[in-house]
Amino acid sequence: MNLKITINQQASISDSLIIANLNLIQFFRDNTFNKIECDQLLTLKDAVQISQILKDQGVLIYEGEINESVITYFQASGLYNQGQGKFIKQVLQIKKLNIPQQEFNNCYGKYDYIEQKFQNQINFFKQVDINGKQEIIDENELLDDGVQVKQVESCASKPRACANCTCGRKEMEEKQDKEQLLEQLKNNSIKGCGSCYLGDAFRCANCPYRGLPAFKDGEQVKVLQDDVFLQEQEEKDQVKLENGKVKLKI
């Protein structure tokens, strides 16, 4: 089977081909395509190349039996199947539809112009009339007497200060707690839990001995204002014990 390109029977191959595509024209010789032994050897890429070198209204004649795959390739490359192995390269033209005016008027719907949407919109940037023609709104009337701003709750009625206290009560209570702790240590007071000597892990939250090392049950812990019990070390401070007593410096 052979492929043949022509516009008509009298035209030569140069009238049907675009001479600029010299690299593709070399496939053609004496108005015939190189012989194809099998239809499967013709690929879509080959069909596209053939369509590219055809001029407008150029005709491709397929000699021999043709199967559906070959027709599909030529149609996919832009050629129109005229039957009997003839394919033509059509010219795509865009024309305006000539619709009578009467049929055009019968069309339903109305074109919505963009300009129409902005004609009835409110102009928020309109200049304010200051000549007294427009009423000026009193800003005091904008607030209603019935609407009241919620006041921040006070912690005066609570036993302890709030967690996010900003009035200074939290700092004052912390200072009082420290003073009370020192006073309890000076008076050798012992809490009722009875676990003060075991260490911080067994002491209650308000234990006056929190922060001090564990001591033996029955030992007296006194606060001496004149003695130094902490000695500065390289890594940490250590508590000095003398005669079973813990010395604190204030």
From Swiss-Prot:
A Pfam family recorded for this sequence: CIAPIN1
- Which residue intervals make up region (N-terminal SAM-like domain)? 1-104
Task: Quote the record's binding site residues for [2Fe-2S] cluster.
Answer: 155, 162, 165, 167
Q: Which cofactor does it need?
A: [2Fe-2S] cluster; [4Fe-4S] cluster
> Which GO terms of the cellular component aspect does the record hold?
cytoplasm; mitochondrial intermembrane space
Instruction: Map motif Cx2C motif 2 onto the chain.
Output: 204-207
Give the UniProt keywords, A-Z: 2Fe-2S, 4Fe-4S, Cytoplasm, Iron, Iron-sulfur, Metal-binding, Mitochondrion
Q: What is its main location?
A: cytoplasm
Q: Name one GO biological process term.
A: iron-sulfur cluster assembly
Q: Name one GO molecular function term.
A: metal ion binding
Q: Where in the cell is it found?
A: Cytoplasm; Mitochondrion intermembrane space
- Annotated positions binding [4Fe-4S] cluster: 193, 196, 204, 207
| Region (Linker) residue spans | 104-149
Among InterPro entries, the record links this protein to: Anamorsin (IPR007785), CIAPIN1 (IPR046408)
Which segments carry the region annotation Fe-S binding site B?
193-207
The UniProt annotation puts motif Cx2C motif 1 at: 193-196
Write out the ranges of the annotated region (Fe-S binding site A): 155-167
Q: What does this protein do?
A: Component of the cytosolic iron-sulfur (Fe-S) protein assembly (CIA) machinery. Required for the maturation of extramitochondrial Fe-S proteins. Part of an electron transfer chain functioning in an early step of cytosolic Fe-S biogenesis, facilitating the de novo assembly of a [4Fe-4S] cluster on the cytosolic Fe-S scaffold complex. Electrons are transferred from NADPH via a FAD- and FMN-containing diflavin oxidoreductase.
Listed PANTHER family: ANAMORSIN
Q: Which family does it belong to?
A: Belongs to the anamorsin family.
**Domain notes, please?**
The C-terminal domain binds 2 Fe-S clusters but is otherwise mostly in an intrinsically disordered conformation. The N-terminal domain has structural similarity with S-adenosyl-L-methionine-dependent methyltransferases, but does not bind S-adenosyl-L-methionine. It is required for correct assembly of the 2 Fe-S clusters.
Cite the record's note on assembly: Monomer.
* Official protein name in the record: Anamorsin homolog 1
What is the organism of origin for this protein? Paramecium tetraurelia
Lineage runs: Eukaryota, Sar, Alveolata, Ciliophora, Intramacronucleata
